[in-house]
From Swiss-Prot:
It is a multi-pass membrane protein. Keywords: Cell inner membrane, Cell membrane, Membrane, Transmembrane, Transmembrane helix. This is UPF0299 membrane protein KPK_1586. Pfam families: LrgA (PF03788). InterPro entries: LrgA/CidA (IPR005538), Uncharacterised_UPF0299 (IPR022957). Belongs to the UPF0299 family. NCBIfam families: PRK01821.1. The lineage of its organism: Bacteria, Pseudomonadati, Pseudomonadota, Gammaproteobacteria, Enterobacterales. It comes from Klebsiella pneumoniae (strain 342). It comes from the Bacteria. It is found in: Cell inner membrane. The chain crosses the membrane at residues 5-25, 26-46, 66-86, 93-113.
């Protein structure tokens, strides 16, 4: 009985913390003069709490595992909603595909550039050093 209560408590705590970050993000999004989805702000809040080790990862791990396990199922209503507007999407399919492709390439370039900027050039262990004959 005690083990069952402990497991229930762990799942309850995980979902309460995840939803608290979500609703805090929604609240903050309502206060901002620009439009940023509250769920994105909530994820950033959760990330900051975990990165600064204010919240231990094991507190949210059970809830995250459940959400990840059933993530594909959670996208079904979104896909059905998109299919309701298939006529509009079909009329604009070319621009949508082009914008997705261009934005993907931009993300690749920005991530590559920022990674090189942050990490710089490092010596590879076991690789011989190049001699500069100038």
């Amino acid at each position: 009985m005690s083990k069952s209560l402990t497991i229930i408590w762990q799942y309850l705590r995980a979902f309460v913390l995840i939803y608290a970050c979500l609703y805090a993000g929604i609240f903050i999004a309502g206060l901002l003069p620009i439009t940023i989805p509250g769920s994105i702000i909530g994820m950033l809040i959760l990330f900051v709490l975990l990165a600064l080790q204010i919240m231990p990862p094991q507190w949210v791990n059970p809830g995250c595992n459940i959400l990840i396990r059933y993530m594909a199922l959670l996208f079904v209503p979104i896909g059905v909603g998109v299919m309701q507007y298939w006529d509009l999407l079909r009329a604009q399919l070319g621009p949508v595909v082009i914008s997705c492709a261009i934005s993907t390439l931009v993300v690749f370039v920005v991530v590559s550039w920022s990674s090189h900027l942050v990490h710089g050039e490092r010596k590879v262990i076991g690789q011989k050093e190049k001699k500069n004959d100038a």
